[in-house]
Amino acid sequence: GYGIKNSDYSWGGDSHAVDNSGDGGGRDFDMFLLSFSESVTLENAAFTWVVGDNDSKEVTVAGLNSIAAFESGANSTWNTVTSAIVENTLGHYGVGSKGSNGLYESTFTKLTGSAKYWLIGAYNTIFDDNAKSNFNSVQLKLSSIGVSMTQPTAEVSEPGALALMGLGLGLVLYRRKRRV
């Protein structure tokens, strides 16, 4: 990561990666908190470095409606954060093999919800109701993300459109009547 240092690093991994390996044998879950000015849907992520394999559960993403749990002085746990997850924004995904672009990619196919705040990081069992007690550790260095944004459709009010059409028709008839 760009200038990011994992403070629970001491066991031989990379201190610049997010992981789900705790210091001294315990578990912790490192995640990036991303903030956007508008609600977006995460489409994919690319990683420059990946260590570990946990099949289809190597990356966890979650859209949040609030980041109050992360504010200074907040006494929060991961269970507190789960209450802020937006519907249809939570998912666990595998990371593919290194592509021709030199990146490992993960596509978030089942996310349909959007949010202004997103967590993305190593697989987090707290957010998985079907989590097994035993899983392999994963370490990731995030390179880029892909997002999409639903553009609101511009609606035209019917009374205004009908009045404008009526005025246009009236002018056409008036011009036609003057010529005759």
What kind of region is each of these model predictions?
Residues G1-D28:
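N-terminal targeting leaders for non-cytosolic proteins
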Residues D30-F32:
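The right-handed parallel beta-helix/beta-solenoid scaffold, focusing on the short coil/turn
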Residues S37-N44:
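Extended extracellular/luminal ectodomain segments enriched in beta-structured repeat modules
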Residues A46-G52:
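Solvent-exposed strand-to-loop "edge" motifs in beta-rich extracellular domains
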Residues D53-F70:
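Short, surface-exposed beta-strand/strand-loop-strand elements in extracellular ectodomains
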Residues G73-A154:
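Terminal, low-complexity interaction segments
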Residues S157-R175:
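A short, hydrophobic C-terminal helix/tail in secreted or cell-surface proteins
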Residues K177-V180:
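Short, charged juxtamembrane terminal tails flanking transmembrane helices
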